[in-house]
Amino acid sequence: MIAAPDRTPLTREFFARPVLDVAPDLLGRVLVRTTPDGPIELRVTEVEAYDGPSDPGSHAYRGRTARNGVMFGPPGHVYVYFTYGMWHCMNLVCGPEGRASAVLLRAGEIIEGAELARTRRLSARNDKELAKGPARLATALEVDRALDGTDACAPEGGPLTLLSGTPVPPDQVRNGPRTGVSGDGGVHPWRFWIDNDPTVSPYRAHTPRRRRT
């Protein structure tokens, strides 16, 4: 008999560790999104680590700005950014305050509230595609910039909470280069995913944009 996922909330101490420890340890954890229409729960299956100002692939690489300020704050908070003029992506701040490390949630399996998630992801061909990719994940969970700075470790709970879930054994975790990261940041094997999980997004190398002529 398979044991039910642990419903104990993750603590701030969990997120206060180095980003390369936190990222693979988030696999199998459960993200609860509480909305006025009901809860949606997602089992994390794919993540990417970004290690602050020392990481050329990180939003914090060039220092603190109005956009990335949450990254420099306490661990356990949510950093949401808007990209390509249409998509949101969700990250979890980790490491010591001021380090500006974060883990991007790239994909997950909707384990509760799939019917609600489907209303937000009408183009998904099946439930495995509901949160297959960071923008799809944020869309399915109705995560946008209004949730930037949310404390996912708040004792009283809130719109976003992480539960202990069922950690993934190390032999089932794979890692490789981060999707779409160019230059020096592209060499780090800091993308982590659950092996053979159908909700994991396909890897795509960085493709330089063509200049208009």
From Swiss-Prot:
Residues 165-187 are annotated as: Disordered. GO terms for biological process: base-excision repair. Its EC number is 3.2.2.-. GO terms for molecular function: alkylbase DNA N-glycosylase activity; DNA binding. Keywords: DNA damage, DNA repair, Hydrolase. Gene3D superfamilies: Methylpurine-DNA glycosylase (MPG). The keyword DNA damage applies. InterPro entries: Formyl_transferase-like_C_sf, MPG, MPG_sf. Belongs to the DNA glycosylase MPG family. HAMAP family: 3MGH. This is Putative 3-methyladenine DNA glycosylase. It comes from Streptomyces avermitilis (strain ATCC 31267 / DSM 46492 / JCM 5070 / NBRC 14893 / NCIMB 12804 / NRRL 8165 / MA-4680). The lineage of its organism: Bacteria, Bacillati, Actinomycetota, Actinomycetes, Kitasatosporales.
